[in-house]
């Protein structure tokens, strides 16, 4: 039920802020916004010997299948326009699921410049090349905890690729 999920999301984000304010503030401060032209900055900072895995399971299950001391970066298939997607409205897609099991929403909601820019630059639903890198997001499942870095990035809306009329105005 979406009303239950919405109420749970509000409770969860408040609880995260109360219990993890210093960790959230640290992640917000160290988060980075990347837009077209900054890929060079990313590649300069890439460590050698990265291990990439594609696993057939949900993102948080994959995270907890790894050793607790693993340094992991997760991809958040995000809303281009809203931090945490429709989390506070009770939706439950991948972006919302990540927020329900972490303090990711608390970090993303502080990225007001990013979301102000993205809401003004929707490119008719095809969006722009942009992402947020958020380090050290704490995830919870059962009685376990695991930190992971998160890249929040939205894919273009497939329906807009074939739509002759823009869904959003610039």
List PLM regions with ranges.
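Macrodomain-like recognition of ADP-ribose-binding/processing modules
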Residues: 1-170
């Amino acid at each position: 039920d979406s009303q239950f999920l919405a109420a749970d999301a509000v409770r969860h984000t408040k609880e995260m802020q109360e219990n993890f304010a210093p960790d959230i503030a640290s992640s917000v401060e160290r988060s980075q916004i990347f837009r077209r032209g900054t890929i060079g900055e990313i590649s300069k900072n890439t460590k050698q010997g990265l291990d990439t895995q594609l696993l057939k399971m949900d993102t948080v299950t994959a995270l907890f299948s790894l050793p607790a001391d693993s340094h992991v970066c997760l991809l958040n298939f995000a809303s281009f326009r809203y931090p945490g997607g429709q989390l506070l409205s009770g939706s439950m897609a991948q972006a919302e699921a990540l927020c329900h099991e972490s303090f990711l929403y608390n970090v993303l909601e502080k990225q007001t410049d990013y979301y102000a820019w993205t809401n003004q630059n929707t490119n008719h639903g095809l969006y722009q090349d942009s992402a947020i890198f958020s380090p050290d997001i704490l995830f919870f499942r059962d009685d376990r905890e695991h930190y992971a870095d998160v890249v929040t990035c939205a894919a273009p809306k497939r329906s807009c690729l074939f739509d002759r009329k823009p869904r959003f105005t610039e």
